[in-house]
Structures are given as structure tokens and as C-alpha cells.
């Protein structure tokens, strides 16, 4: 699949289950999906209850030989990946191929920091959850059950945002200069513009 057809989603502010369901459907249909900022994904319900549920889930193991599984993930990106896996027939070739089309990241690593990121309105917390309802952050939950890189991810995100601000300022300045340059030569190129319009080359 072409690079332009990769769907880059920003996980921040989305509900875990709803986003996972939409992503699962897209990868089954053959689209390549990349989900960034998984630490900003939300889970409905208060934090304490979600933490108890996840800790209960972590306690499940094979009594005779725990090394045989189940294997539990602590990073937000891997928790999201496993949620999507549960919505796919991952033990079949079709399901495995679909799972291979999904990439998940904590923070926004290169080259995705330079690409346009999309949101899914059907999975956004502000759209789907009443303002009075409680919710938890996947990043905080992951941190409290053993994820060690919350501070590192936060630091890298701050650096990325600073770089993005500088880039945006430069872009605005260039756009302003371009508009000014176009305005300066507008009268000089009027006759050429009219000729191009008559030939249908300029609208």
C-alpha cells in the first residue's frame, strides 16, 4: 500500500474501546493505521475502578507454569494494541495480516511528527461522554501498574512541541512574505493573468 494511504491517528482525547473498534475495522479492510500519543487515550469510569480492574487482569496466570502466559503489557501503546487484537481474529492468517498493518506509539516519534494527524469524531471523549462523567488517562494507569517511561515520554513531547512552535512561526512568516510579494507584483502581472483566464488555465 502506498505511503499516502497510511492513516495516522492522534490517540489523545479518544475513548479506548471506541477507537480500538474503529481501528480494528480499518486494518481488516486493508488500511495501514498508525496511532500516536497512546498515553493520552481516555478510559470511561473513574481511575481507581479502572486500576482495580487492570490489576485483577494482571493477576491472571497459568498456575502450573506462569512463564507460559498470559503475557501482560505495561506501556499504553501495547495496552491499546492488545485491545485492538482482542477485536480481531488474530489467530487466523487474515487477522494476523490485519494486526501487522497496525503500528502504535507512545508520544509522536519521527517521521510521524511531520505528518498530518487525524482524529475520529465517533470515538472522541468530548463527543461520546457526558461532561459530568468520570474518566481516566491510559498513561496514568500504565504508569501505576509498572510503565517506567512516563517522564521520558513527557519530556520528549515538550521538546517536540517547542520545535513545532518554531516551525509554525517560520511557516507563518513565509506565508506573510509570499502574500506581500504577490500583492507587490499584482499590477505588473494583470495582463498575463487575463490571458491565462481566457485560455482556461487560471480560475
Curated annotation (Swiss-Prot):
Gene3D superfamilies (alphabetical): 6.10.250.3250, Ribosomal protein L13
Entry keyword annotation includes Cell division: no
Post-translational modification N-acetylalanine, affected residues: 2
Molecular function via GO: mRNA binding; structural constituent of ribosome
Keywords assigned: Acetylation, Citrullination, Cytoplasm, Phosphoprotein, Ribonucleoprotein, Ribosomal protein, Translation regulation
Phosphoserine modified-residue sites: 77
Listed CDD domains: Ribosomal_L13 (cd00392)
Subcellular location, principal: cytoplasm
Posttranslational modification: Phosphorylation at Ser-77 upon interferon-gamma treatment in macrophages involves a DAPK1-DAPK3 kinase cascade and is causing release from the ribosome, association with the GAIT complex and subsequent involvement in transcript-selective translation inhibition. Citrullinated by PADI4.
Keyword check for Ribosomal protein: yes
Compartment(s) of residence: Cytoplasm
Modified residues (Citrulline): 59, 140
GO cellular component, one term: ribosome
Pfam families: Ribosomal_L13
Function: Associated with ribosomes but is not required for canonical ribosome function and has extra-ribosomal functions. Component of the GAIT (gamma interferon-activated inhibitor of translation) complex which mediates interferon-gamma-induced transcript-selective translation inhibition in inflammation processes. Upon interferon-gamma activation and subsequent phosphorylation dissociates from the ribosome and assembles into the GAIT complex which binds to stem loop-containing GAIT elements in the 3'-UTR of diverse inflammatory mRNAs (such as ceruplasmin) and suppresses their translation.
PANTHER family (UniProt xref): LARGE RIBOSOMAL SUBUNIT PROTEIN UL13 (PTHR11545:SF3), RIBOSOMAL PROTEIN L13 (PTHR11545)
Record NCBIfam families: L13_A_E
Protein name: Large ribosomal subunit protein uL13
